Amino acid sequence: MDTKMQSLPTTHPHPHSSSRPQSHTSNQCNQCTCSHHCRSCSQAGHAGSSSSPSPGPPMKHPKPSVHSRHSPARPSHRGSCPKNRKTFEGKVSKRKAVRRRKRTHRAKRRSSGRRYK
């Protein structure tokens, strides 16, 4: 009985002492991971919102940048648009339509081929 009692308390403090520093380090790690996660999250929000629609908070950041990009693009677009239309109105529209049709046909063929496989 004495041996069992001695082994129990001896075994008990050992895992306890080893567990203490682990929980301490894990706490510090969690704090680090949390701050890193927040930073990576905000960065991901910046990159993701421009390529795909993201939730409200991240959208607020890119809005001014998108607005500033659109402002200079609008007048230049307006200036080049009427010139292009007047010069190659029919030709450009026909070429675009033909190209689009070819692309859709290719995509349909590929998708149907994949489905058959």
Swiss-Prot record:
Q: Where is the composition biased (Low complexity)?
A: 7-26, 44-53
Output compositional bias ranges, type Basic residues. Answer: 60-77, 93-117
UniProt keyword Zinc present = yes
Q: Which InterPro entries match?
A: TP2
Q: Name one GO molecular function term.
A: DNA binding
List every position bearing Phosphoserine: S112
Null allele outcome, as annotated, is:
Male mice lacking both Tnp1 and Tnp2 are completely infertile, but protamine alone are capable of histone eviction. A significant proportion of Prm2 remains unprocessed. Chromatin in mature spermatozoa shows defects in density.
Q: Where does this polypeptide localize?
A: Nucleus; Chromosome
Instruction: State the family it belongs to.
Output: Belongs to the nuclear transition protein 2 family.
Q: Where is this motif: Nuclear localization signal?
A: 90-98
Indicate where this protein is primarily found.
Answer: nucleus
Q: Where does Zn(2+) bind?
A: H12, H14, H16, H24, C32, C34, C38, C41
Query: One of this protein's GO BP terms?
Result: sperm DNA condensation
Organism name: Mus musculus
Name the UniProt key words of this record, in alphabetical order. Answer: Chromosome, Developmental protein, Differentiation, DNA-binding, Metal-binding, Nucleosome core, Nucleus, Phosphoprotein, Spermatogenesis, Zinc
The encoding gene is Tnp2
Q: Which GO terms describe its cellular component?
A: male germ cell nucleus; nucleosome; nucleus
Pfam families per the UniProt record, alphabetical = TP2
Q: What is this protein called?
A: Nuclear transition protein 2
Q: Where is this region: Disordered?
A: 1-117
Q: What does this protein do?
A: Plays a key role in the replacement of histones to protamine in the elongating spermatids of mammals. In condensing spermatids, loaded onto the nucleosomes, where it promotes the recruitment and processing of protamines, which are responsible for histone eviction. The histone H2AB1-H2BC1/TH2B dimer is required for loading of TNP2 onto chromatin.
